[in-house]
Amino acid sequence: MNKILKGDEVIVLTGRDKKRRGVVLARVDADHVLVEGVNVVKKHQKANPMANNPGGIVEKTLPIHISNVALFNPATGKADRVGFKEEDGRKVRVFRSNGAAVGAKA
């Protein structure tokens, strides 16, 4: 089981977007994630009439390494590490600081 999944709210730990929060849009591969509003770049797109693409300057979200983000703990308001606990025969993700289940309503 992965520690960070699609739909999790994360906070960026390093880089130009440090301390910015966002929701994980997708896992690109084992160690990269797409985070909403983080690592957005402007790409100069050439027009392509065959593909009905007008071209221009397009904003694109690039992947960020999973080691540069941490799960946001709403109870503490800070970044938190993730651990695993077995509950009712299932493996559940929990916050390391307070032991609360990830995604559980407070």
UniProtKB/Swiss-Prot annotation:
Q: Name one GO cellular component term.
A: ribonucleoprotein complex
Q: Which GO terms describe its biological process?
A: translation
Reply yes or no: does the keyword Transferase apply.
no
Q: Which UniProt keywords apply?
A: Ribonucleoprotein, Ribosomal protein, RNA-binding, rRNA-binding
Give yes or no: UniProt keyword rRNA-binding: yes
One of this protein's Pfam families, by short name? Answer: ribosomal_L24
Family of this protein: Belongs to the universal ribosomal protein uL24 family.
Q: Could you tell me what this protein does?
A: One of two assembly initiator proteins, it binds directly to the 5'-end of the 23S rRNA, where it nucleates assembly of the 50S subunit.
Q: Please name the PANTHER family in this protein's record.
A: MITOCHONDRIAL RIBOSOMAL PROTEIN L24
- Assembly and interaction partners: Part of the 50S ribosomal subunit.
State the name under which the record lists this protein.
Large ribosomal subunit protein uL24
Tell me the organism's taxonomic lineage.
Bacteria, Pseudomonadati, Pseudomonadota, Betaproteobacteria, Burkholderiales
- Primary gene name: rplX
